[in-house]
Amino acid sequence: MELKQIATAGTMESSDIMITLSPNKTGLEIKLQSNVEKQFGQQIRTMIESVLKQFEITNVTVDAVDKGALDCTIKARTIVAVYRGLGKEDYDWEEINKWIA
């Protein structure tokens, strides 16, 4: 799938993450800013990438600003950003529940 527009989800508050997705033509690029990047950076990137793979999104630039978000928050923010970027308003919860657990 291809993103139709730039989309953002999340906040800059403590224990949250702001995910911004921008369409590109060069593949997946994840730019991460996090105070815990040395400890958890690879795990954060892997979670973001796994959500994008579920939606079959390959050409996207991800700008992620982490403020100590838990795994479930990272996944949720990425899902919301994808739906916004695709211009979808109806969430397919049954499908999401199959692969998010």
UniProtKB/Swiss-Prot annotation:
Keyword Phosphoprotein included in the entry's annotation: yes
Residue positions, PTM O-(phosphoribosyl dephospho-coenzyme A)serine: 14
Cystine connections: none
Cellular location(s): Cytoplasm
Coiled coil: none
A Pfam entry, by short name: ACP
Parts of the chain that traverse the membrane: none
Keywords assigned by UniProt, alphabetized: Cytoplasm, Phosphoprotein
GO CC entries: cytoplasm
Signal peptide: none
Domain of life: Bacteria
Family: Belongs to the CitD family.
Described purpose of this protein according to its UniProt entry: Covalent carrier of the coenzyme of citrate lyase.
Self-association and partners: Oligomer with a subunit composition of (alpha,beta,gamma)6.
Record protein name field: Citrate lyase acyl carrier protein
Gene behind the chain: citD
